[in-house]
Regions:
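Auxiliary, metal-adjacent structural segments of Zn-dependent hydrolase domains
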Residues: 1-29, 91-93
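Active-site scaffold of zinc-dependent metalloenzymes
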Residues: 25-50
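Short alpha-helix carrying the canonical HExxH Zn2+-binding catalytic motif
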Residues: 52-61
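Catalytic Zn2+-binding segment of zinc metalloproteases
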Residues: 61-73
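Post-HExxH zinc-binding segment in Zn-dependent metallohydrolases
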Residues: 75-93
Length: 93
């Protein structure tokens, strides 16, 4: 699946789970937080799309997605990123 298609799938997943993805600019990598009781994931739109996708995959890998339908390519991507992080190989992505 192409990076832009993965990004679209992450946007759909975020809406389904009640999250908002904020595309910001600045000196930050990105991540999840709660802002005035809203669940948000902030990603840096100045970073390459691969890095933005990695941030989203990391955040969604922390959530219980067992009962949530994901297209197989998205679930596979989230699992791959999660496994790299667990193995301490996130710098090799």
């Amino acid at each position: 699946m192409k990076p832009n298609q993965l990004m679209d799938q992450f946007e759909t997943l975020a809406k389904k789970l009640g999250f908002k993805i904020i595309h910001g600019k600045g000196d930050f990598a990105g991540g999840g937080c709660t802002l005035k009781e809203d669940k948000v994931i902030v990603i840096n739109k100045l970073k390459p799309i691969e890095q933005r996708l990695k941030v989203l995959a990391q955040e969604f890998s922390l959530m219980n997605l067992k009962g949530v339908f994901l297209i197989p390519a998205l679930r596979k991507y989230i699992n791959e990123i999660s496994n790299f992080i667990l193995l301490g190989e996130e710098n090799n992505l």
